[in-house]
Amino acid sequence: MTVKSTILYFTFALLISQLTGCGGGGGSEQNNNSNVSNNASNQNSTSVQNNADNNNSQGGDSNTDNSGDSSGDQGDADQGGSNQGGSDQDNGDQSDSTQSDETFSSKQQVSRFIQQATFGATPTQIVSLHEKSASDWLKAQMEQPASLVLPSVVAAAPDDPDDGFNLFHIEQTSLAFWRNSIAGEDQLRQRVAFALSELLVVSNAGGEVLTDIPEAVAAYQDILIQNAFGNYRHILELVTYSPAMGHYLTYMGSEKGNEQTGRMPDENYARELLQLFTLGIVALNKDGSVKLNSEGAPVELYNNTDITGLARVFTGLNLNEDDPEELINTRFTKPMQIFPESHSEKEKVFLGLTIPAGTGAKASITQALDHIFNHANLAPFVSKQLIQRLVTSNPSPEYTSRVVNAFESGSFELPDGSSVGSSGRGDLAATFAAILFDEEARTQAAENGGKIREPILRFTHWARAFNVENIEPKYIPQLWETGATADLGQHPYRSPSVFNYFRPGYKAPGSKSAELGLVAPELQITNASSIPGYINFMTYFVMGQQQEADVDELKEEFDEIGVEFDLQEALQSFRPNYDPLLEIADSPTELVAYLDLLLCAQQLSDQTKQNITTALSKIPSDEDDGFLPRVHLAILMVMSSPDYLVQK
């Protein structure tokens, strides 16, 4: 048996021995006791819930969220970050407040917080932030300049726009994402923007326009990145005028109705704006629970008449035509333009608001967004989903209420006594601070808490944890498309529909978590194919096979499109640094303890640690590589264990 096959054998053996009947899209149930609700003995966690429903689910499911199924069409399918290492700034010596911030009082607490707030903790962060001020770290992160996507896309565009298909240009939205998420100094901003992207979904997965014109999605990504700590109302405005969203949800070019021809305004954006981006479909209490009428049934917020009225608001928007000579790629980066002759002059009635007949497009959009933004459902609907993306899948009503208070007041007091937020409703700086510093996020949580780590976050965590060198994803073809279940099973900004990869209210069929009434959104993309796919994907990188790849074919592709190819950079790209692990690898116990803190914030159960330690002891020092095979196995077993896959 080769070293690689031995490592894979032990990794699969551990996973199979611990994996429970979590269910998932098409996966078979397995009978053991480690899942979302019970994956490690006496471990802490928090939870999240959600209410946007996905009608593009995998396998049978039970739907308990607040978004239902869409009855309309789903649409067609500064500089970038440094490429050297992760963001390790401690920013811990700036506090002038009198209150003590104990959030980072232990390395375990640092690791856990940073895993929730970024794309993964680094060894340097865990050491340097220990006993520093988490409040100062958060405020410093909010001041970090934004690492943007569009500049990279524009720089990669062919000199002659008529040159045709250019894969390197098209893939820049993905390459910039990987670079920024792993190496960006603005880690909190990047992580928050990714969370927002899973709520306000635009995808270039379907090919055609949003694939061929990457500037569109890049500009959309930058909206979320630049406004990650801004106001949700402002984001709704920018999203509404975004050509990427306009094309994706098919209201770009929507015209006023014509009774003679039977033409009606496109209703797609109106429906998803209410259902997925702002309110859901049933009334919510402040704590995120569903309001019931006198008969015990959920209270529906609107009907199709409301959608029809709101759809009139978004007529008359199309690509900017101020400069007829401007390239279409550039026009897709600018807000859509209003064409008054195409805008509906009719009265627009929805959700109790009447916009008088004859009101222009700009005023109609402003009034409509203001009315939706001030609706009582918006704060709990949005807040609960953002908790879910960062901390936990099933937050308590009290946790949700506290975050809703921060969203509505626009202010949050940090542990050091200082405040963040503009004191305006919808302030996201206050909202995300409330999510991360809440007592439920920071203290030992219920056994049923936690969230499944998304595949994207697992990979970025590995890259940051082991300080990969030369972060140039352009040299790693595997990162150009990771959405297949044979790979990660998820790719940034390429969800299969406007409902994201998974629904916030998803309950895995046949799972113990579902029996307990718990949602587990990420399990919707967990199945019999995705589990070995993830392990194989990580094995490639963990074992350094990217440094052994035959780059001749890749060089030919670069030469064909006229992109400079650096052989040494290609061979060194994403090379991990395992030196700290090799220094202690002669002791399996020390090795597991190191990885437990770095990757799991000391959440590995005693049984898991024992299983891994036993397996590692059977991997001797290699004549050529020393204990490197043992290090490889240790990382793979930890990152494949349910104790890691469930972020507590």
Placement of each model-derived feature along the sequence:
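Long, intrinsically disordered low-complexity tandem-repeat segments
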Residues: 74-89, 94
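Active-site substrate-binding loop specific to GH73 endo-beta-N-acetylglucosaminidase modules
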Residues: 106, 126, 130-133, 140-142, ...
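Flexible, low-complexity segments enriched for small/polar residues
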Residues: 111-118, 200, 375-379, 383-423, ...
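N-terminal mature-domain "stem" immediately C-terminal to a signal peptide or N-terminal signal-anchor/transmembrane
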Residues: 99-147
